Regions:
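Bacterial N-terminal signal peptides
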Residues: 7-14
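Small-residue packing motifs within transmembrane alpha-helices
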Residues: 6-7, 307
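Positively charged n-region of N-terminal signal peptides that target proteins for export
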Residues: 1-4
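Noncatalytic, solvent-exposed loop/strand surfaces
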Residues: 19-597
Length: 598
């Protein structure tokens, strides 16, 4: 009988190794791992052809109609483990508006009625070279109401894979634990007791750590029938939740996470609104009127990040004031570790990113007022602040040295935002002047690391204001639109510029029709979370409708046109264990690669 020990031990070792390899090459969550680094240790394929195309959002034409032709929906990243793919699919009902855009006047249609849609998590599997449906799980999750706070930008629905299960967001702050193989419910986890409150929402993607714990944000909002949940009432509750592998859950309130933040009815610094006082700041000593902060809560699409040492990172903001924002660190038992304010960190405003007008030309376009203090944000007359907006999907990224990146929004650099870097102890280190709706990808190499982020320059708006009658708000030209690789100090190493100028669409017969020179300065990069493979190859989407693979040195490796040049909320992509690329365009899942190696 003792002779059986060696085969049994060998079998255990082999099973353990196979499990570790499956996990190493999986894409189980936002940003691939709990640090959200966007890196996977496989060699990505060259996207030479489409291998699959599946519609997951049938409401795209209606969504575009209500958004003036754009697609303002944040979608889940395709989750992958082995030969299985897990993706959101939308069903239910889209309520059309009597007149396109009338939801903006409060009509119960379009984004104001997106709770009539149904969200499903569907398992797909590769069989005989085709990606086919395996099972479907219909959840009761709904997004936060649009109200006057989300402006038609649909929040993200985002499960996570962990230890053989799919954790799927549910209603009332709950999570469904679903068997990964067959879609059967294993348990329904409710951290808030037996009640399921329809005005309590799982907010943002779920994050799974290496120990099988799952983390997510929850917020409770006012019933829209009582008051607008964003500006008519303070947030009623906000929590970070941790679910252990045994389904036990624990919560901590955001009020406890940011004890030094302004209170719900305290005043927070405002911005200048009166366009008759342009150029801003109105005077060297002007101070904008304050307004109520609101209680602290997470940003709508924020996923917690988990460092290898167990530290948890999330983003908090005032309910009424996105500038009253913090990077928050927690211990693994959900006790507060530290909080770092994002306010008044930047000195790159007037005189740097924005010229200060000369006395001889006080109305110089896109300039600060004569005599302005160098470095200030002209909209506040104070050092610039990173803000946490509910319209983006930026999420903390933990770097190899333990420091943390966050993408934030700033208005005064033509809405490009800033990528901010903090130390593991909460000290502010530096910034790069783009960060809007971005979770950057990280590539370790040569004893250091590099960071990849989109770097769009937006046109059609002024640098810091929107009055078309004022020279201070002269619209900027579009572009350039770059993918930029930064070093560890957030200094550019290379930039890859989008040079596509024509708008194309794929016809039903597979042919492609293009209209030339619609975008003479190129297209935006339509990416909120890039992918980097083991060779340093970067994979990104563009609003020109193509998937791009960029070499490690920033040159083009290959690009593949998918379906349609489209203006859209930025989308993520992922890689499978065999290097296939899973990307998105026009509400459709595309798989690209070199062939059908099954």
């Amino acid at each position: 009988m003792k002779r059986l020990v060696i085969p049994i031990l060998c079998g255990i070792v082999l099973l353990t190794a196979a499990k570790a390899e499956l996990e190493r090459t999986a894409w189980p969550q936002w940003g691939q791992n709990a640090q959200h680094s966007g890196f996977i240790g496989v060699q990505g394929q060259t996207p030479k052809k489409q291998l699959a195309q599946i519609v997951y959002d049938p409401f795209v034409p209606q969504e575009q109609t209500e958004a003036g032709g754009e697609l303002l929906v944040h979608y889940q990243v395709p989750l992958i483990e082995g030969k299985h793919v897990y993706m959101e699919f939308k069903t239910g009902t889209w309520v059309p508006c009597s007149t396109p855009g009338s939801w903006g006047n409060g009509e119960a249609c379009g984004p104001n009625a997106w709770n009539q849609e149904i969200w499903n998590e569907k398992a797909l599997a590769w069989r005989d070279g085709k990606l086919v449906a395996d099972w479907n799980f219909q959840t009761d999750w709904k997004p936060e109401p649009n109200g006057f706070g989300l402006n038609g930008w649909e929040p993200v629905f985002h499960p996570a894979l962990s230890r053989g299960f799919v954790y799927v967001p549910g209603a009332g702050g709950t999570v469904w634990k679903v068997n990964r193989e067959n879609g059967h419910v294993v348990s329904h986890i409710n951290p808030f007791g037996s009640m399921v409150d329809p005005n309590t929402f799982v907010s943002g993607p779920l994050t799974a750590d290496a120990h099988g714990n799952v983390y997510y944000n929850v917020m409770q909002l006012e019933d829209p029938a009582v008051a607008d949940p964003w500006f008519g009432s303070d947030v009623l509750g906000a929590w970070l939740v941790k679910v252990k592998p045994n389904d036990q859950s624990m919560t901590v309130t955001y009020a406890d996470l940011v004890p030094g933040a302004p209170g719900a009815f305290d005043n927070c610094p405002g911005i200048f609104f009166d366009t008759t006082t342009l150029p801003w700041p109105p005077s060297p000593t002007a101070v904008p009127d304050p307004f109520p902060c609101g209680s602290q809560r997470p940003g709508v699409n924020v996923a917690p990040a988990i460092a290898p040492d167990g530290t948890i990172y999330t983003l908090s903001r005032g309910h009424f004031d996105q500038f009253a924002a913090y990077l928050v660190a927690l211990n693994s038992d959900l006790t507060p570790k530290w909080q770092a304010s994002l306010q008044n960190r930047f000195t790159d405003g007037c005189g740097f990113l924005i010229p200060i007008a000369a006395s001889a030309n006080p109305n110089q376009p896109n300039s600060c007022r004569v005599g302005t203090t160098p470095g200030v944000d002209p909209t506040t007359n104070a050092p610039g602040s990173g803000s946490v907006t509910d319209l983006g999907s930026s999420t903390p990224t933990v770097l190899p040295d333990g420091s943390v990146l966050i993408g934030t929004f700033t208005l005064y650099n033509a809405e490009r935002g800033h990528l901010m870097k903090f130390s593991a102890s909460g000290a502010y280190l530096t910034a790069f002047d783009f960060g809007w709706d971005s979770t950057p990808a990280v590539f370790r190499h040569d004893g250091t690391y590099s960071i990849v982020i989109k770097d769009n320059h937006y046109g059609g708006i002024g640098l810091y204001c929107f009055d078309p009658t004022s020279p201070s708000c002269t619209p900027l030209p579009n572009g350039p639109y770059n993918i930029t690789r930064l070093n560890a100090d957030l200094k550019p190493e290379w930039k890859f510029k989008n040079t596509t100028t024509g708008s194309c669409q794929r016809n039903p017969d597979g042919s492609v029709t293009c209209t030339p020179n619609t975008h003479p300065n190129g297209f935006e990069w339509c990416i909120n979370a890039p992918v980097i493979d083991e060779n340093g190859t970067v994979y990104v989407n563009s609003e020109d409708g193509s998937l791009y693979a960029l070499n490690r040195n920033g040159t083009l490796k290959h690009k593949l046109f998918l379906n349609l040049a489209i203006g859209a909320a930025y989308t993520p992509l992922s890689l499978g264990p065999d290097g296939k690329i899973y990307t998105q365009n026009d509400g459709q899942l595309f798989v690209a690669g070199e062939g059908e190696d099954e």
